[in-house]
Swiss-Prot record:
Modification type N6-acetyllysine: residues: K147
Protein name: Ras-related C3 botulinum toxin substrate 2
Gene that specifies this protein: RAC2
High-level lineage: Eukaryota, Metazoa, Chordata, Craniata, Vertebrata
Binding locations of GTP: 10-17, 57-61, 115-118
Mutagenesis or variant effect for N92T: In IMD73B; uncertain significance; cells transfected with this variant show higher production of reactive oxygen species compared to wild-type; potential gain-of-function variant
Taxonomic source organism: Homo sapiens
């Protein structure tokens, strides 16, 4: 059975840990959400192929900037996450996360993931953003950023409602099993 290492990165509080907990337990976490979810390994079937999917959470806070790259070696696919209701986290994909991932792993496939999809149409959330002269990130904006960073796919999901959640991980597996021909064949990430 093929083993796939999937590492999840993005700003603090964009919902990386909730994404992983919701996917692996089929339940949105209650009050307590840890900073970092323990590494998790699951046997899953995608396109009738059995795969051992290893999920690695990371802490997005700056305090972890030196430690985080230690989880990057041998990564098969990255999920770079931003919150659809946090324009700052969207900008940081370009400013921080894409450069960091590419520095350590020049050819590992990336899936860009917009989280908190359930809040994009939430009146209170929209109102709070409006007060700061901001708005939620739209699907076309997400697609444009995905193209800019040469992401394999752009997907949106909600860990709360689970809408689009399984697709994120299925597509992460497909990005490894069915690599796009334009990418270099050597994908494993190594620490230099």
């Amino acid at each position: 059975m093929q083993a796939i290492k999937c590492v999840v990165v993005g700003d603090g509080a964009v919902g990386k840990t909730c994404l992983l907990i919701s996917y692996t337990t089929n339940a949105f976490p209650g009050e307590y959400i840890p900073t970092v979810f323990d590494n998790y390994s699951a046997n899953v079937m995608v396109d009738s192929k059995p795969v051992n999917l290893g999920l690695w959470d990371t802490a997005g806070q700056e305090d972890y900037d030196r430690l985080r790259p230690l989880s990057y070696p041998q990564t098969d696919v990255f999920l770079i996450c931003f919150s659809l209701v946090s324009p700052a986290s969207y900008e940081n994909v370009r400013a921080k996360w894409f450069p960091e991932v590419r520095h350590h792993c020049p050819s590992t496939p990336i899936i860009l993931v917009g989280t908190k999809l359930d809040l994009r149409d939430d009146k209170d959330t929209i109102e709070k953003l409006k007060e700061k002269k901001l708005a939620p990130i739209t699907y076309p904006q997400g697609l444009a950023l995905a193209k800019e960073i040469d992401s394999v796919k752009y997907l949106e999901c909600s860990a709360l409602t689970q809408r689009g959640l399984k697709t994120v991980f299925d597509e992460a597996i497909r990005a490894v099993l069915c690599p796009q021909p334009t990418r270099q064949q050597k994908r494993a990430c190594s620490l230099l």
